[in-house]
Curated annotation (Swiss-Prot):
Keywords: Ribonucleoprotein, Ribosomal protein, RNA-binding, rRNA-binding, tRNA-binding. PANTHER family: 50S/60S RIBOSOMAL PROTEIN L16 (PTHR12220), LARGE RIBOSOMAL SUBUNIT PROTEIN UL16M (PTHR12220:SF13). Signal peptide: none annotated. Part of the 50S ribosomal subunit. This is Large ribosomal subunit protein uL16. GO terms for biological process: translation. The keyword Transmembrane helix does not apply. One of its GO terms (cellular component) is cytosolic large ribosomal subunit. InterPro entries: Ribosomal_uL16, Ribosomal_uL16_bact-type, Ribosomal_uL16_CS, Ribosomal_uL16_dom, Ribosomal_uL16_sf. Pfam families: Ribosomal_L16.
Length: 139
């Protein structure tokens, strides 16, 4: 699963997801992309599940790029713990995704295969997504 090797601070504040994505909004590496339509925290487990679903369908043909990285720790208190006594320990990692962000890219496969692979990947994610094709793509 994806997570940073080391971080400057172990715990972060929650923050809020205002507005649209400023960068990472166009297909850069492959010919096809999966774009986020709504904001969300995507966990490293969800990213991995989507990646596995795409790889299984594409049968290791072509190449997949993951354009998001879970760099935000989410802390959680232990079960049946009284309130107070500090913030909980980091439990899992999330990637903050805003609308318009390209999350996954693929290349080296026909459009029909890429469309189905991204559809399967989108089922593993907690947000609405859209299939994007590079403007200069020719079959």
């Amino acid at each position: 699963m994806l997570m940073p090797k080391r971080v400057k601070y172990r715990k972060t504040q929650r923050g809020r997801m205002k507005g649209n994505a400023g960068r990472g909004t166009s297909v850069a590496f492959g010919s096809f992309g999966l774009k986020a339509i709504e904001p969300a925290w995507i966990t490293s487990r969800q990213i991995e599940a989507a990646r596995v679903a795409m790889n299984r369908y594409m049968k290791r043909d072509g190449k997949i790029w993951i354009r998001i990285f879970p760099d935000k720790p989410v802390s959680k208190k232990a079960a049946e713990t009284r309130m107070g006594s500090g913030k909980g320990s980091p439990e899992f990692w999330v990637a903050v995704v805003k609308p318009g962000r390209i999350m996954f890219e693929a290349d080296g496969v026909p459009m029909e295969v890429a469309t189905e692979a991204f559809r399967l990947a989108a089922k593993k994610l907690p947000i609405k997504t859209r299939f994007i094709v590079r403007p200069d793509y020719e079959a």
